From Swiss-Prot:
InterPro entries linked: TBSV_p22
The entry's keywords: Host membrane, Host-virus interaction, Membrane, Phosphoprotein, RNA-binding, Transport, Viral movement protein
PTM description: Phosphorylated.
Species this protein is from: Tomato bushy stunt virus (strain A23)
Protein name as it appears in the record: Movement protein
Single Gene Ontology MF annotation: RNA binding
Pfam families linked: TBSV_P22 (PF03558)
GO CC, one annotated term: membrane
Protein purpose: Transports viral genome to neighboring plant cells directly through plasmosdesmata, without any budding. The movement protein allows efficient cell to cell propagation, by bypassing the host cell wall barrier.
Assembly and binders: Interacts with host protein HFI22.
């Protein structure tokens, strides 16, 4: 799999305006290519790709991620691509450690993976192996951003037909309540 990625320095407000731009996925359905956008889940956007043929392959994925945390926090992590059709979550791809305080642009020319049109085989992108220089804040920055590809259990078209639905999910890991210390130090990031 050929992968290119870069990190960009821009003010956060400029990056926020671009949050819906640049995230695209080229899907090969049978003999045809279809380009679909990837949008954050809060846009409540789902893209329908008509099912035809036995398998769907994914190519030319372009993902732009705006900063997830403050640049001053110094949080870094690796972007993983996993097949989560089983409990092992087989790794399909992994980047080098990236600064989560900057914009990340990721381009993948081809995924060595096909999704059957008759089964539910989700593929997930997410940040793992997060590292923070602030020991107490490591769990605080356990933020995952996932792009999940899978079959929908519902019909989204009239007349009724089967559709492949692709959606992006933003998920915050639930922080476990920690034991309160007798004395707290007022440090913030």
């Amino acid at each position: 799999m050929d992968t290119e990625y870069e990190q960009v320095n821009k003010p956060w407000n400029e990056l926020y305006k671009e949050t819906t731009l640049g995230n695209k996925l080229m899907v090969n359905v049978g003999m045809e290519d279809q380009e679909v956008p990837l949008l954050p889940s809060n846009f409540l956007t789902k893209v329908r790709v008509g099912l035809s043929g036995g398998y769907i392959t994914m190519r030319r994925i372009r993902i732009k991620i705006i900063p997830l945390v403050s640049r001053k926090a110094g949080v870094s992590g690796k972007l993983y691509l996993r097949d989560i059709s089983d409990t092992k979550g087989r790794k399909l791809h992994c980047t080098e450690s990236l600064d989560l305080g900057r914009e990340i642009r990721l381009t993948m020319q081809h995924l060595d993976f096909s999704v059957s049109t008759r089964s539910d085989v989700p593929i997930v992108f997410g940040f793992e192996e997060l590292v923070s220089p602030f020991l107490e804040g490591r769990e605080l920055f356990s933020i995952s951003v996932k792009w999940q590809f899978g079959l929908s259990k519902n019909c989204y078209s009239l007349p009724q037909s089967k559709w492949k639905v692709m959606y992006q999910e933003d998920a915050l890991k639930v922080l476990k309540p920690s034991k309160k210390k007798a004395s707290k130090t007022g440090s913030s990031v």
